[in-house]
From Swiss-Prot:
Listed Pfam families: Kunitz_BPTI
Single annotated GO MF: potassium channel regulator activity
Family from the record: Belongs to the venom Kunitz-type family. 01 (intermediate) subfamily.
UniProt keyword terms in alphabetical order: Disulfide bond, Protease inhibitor, Secreted, Serine protease inhibitor, Signal
Chain ranges of the BPTI/Kunitz inhibitor domain: 37-85
Function: Serine protease inhibitor that inhibits trypsin at a molar ratio of 1:1.
Subcellular localization: Secreted
Protein name: Kunitz-type U15-theraphotoxin-Hhn1q
PANTHER family cross-referenced by the UniProt entry: KUNITZ-TYPE PROTEASE INHIBITOR 2
Gene Ontology biological process terms from the UniProt entry: envenomation resulting in negative regulation of voltage-gated potassium channel activity in another organism
Organism, scientific name: Cyriopagopus hainanus
Disulfide cross-links: 37-85, 60-81
Main location: secreted
Length: 88
């Protein structure tokens, strides 16, 4: 591999880092709170019936979770949901 290719790769990776680094530090991604709380409810792939809570953008709403899969916008109690997702 020639020196020109190595320098091109280093330059590309440097630019990529400079462009993406501020996004990684933004409030939307810092602790995952906003991203998690913006996800839709997802009952998962199984057919169990567990009462769980998800944040719908305004408040926490009860839904039935199937027991496997789904996403991180799923909480065991309304209180846990509000503590994670409600804006202070």
């Amino acid at each position: 591999m020639g020196i020109a290719r190595i320098l091109s790769a280093v330059l590309f990776l440097s630019v990529l880092f400079v462009v993406t680094f501020p996004t990684l530090l933004s409030a939307d991604h810092h602790d995952g709170r906003i991203d998690t709380c913006r996800l839709p409810s997802d009952r998962g792939r199984c057919k169990a019936s567990f009462e769980r809570w998800y944040f719908n953008g305004t408040t926490c709403t009860k839904f039935v979770y199937g027991g496997y899969g789904g996403n991180d916008n799923r909480f065991p109690t309304e209180k846990a949901c509000m503590e994670r997702c409600a804006k202070a």
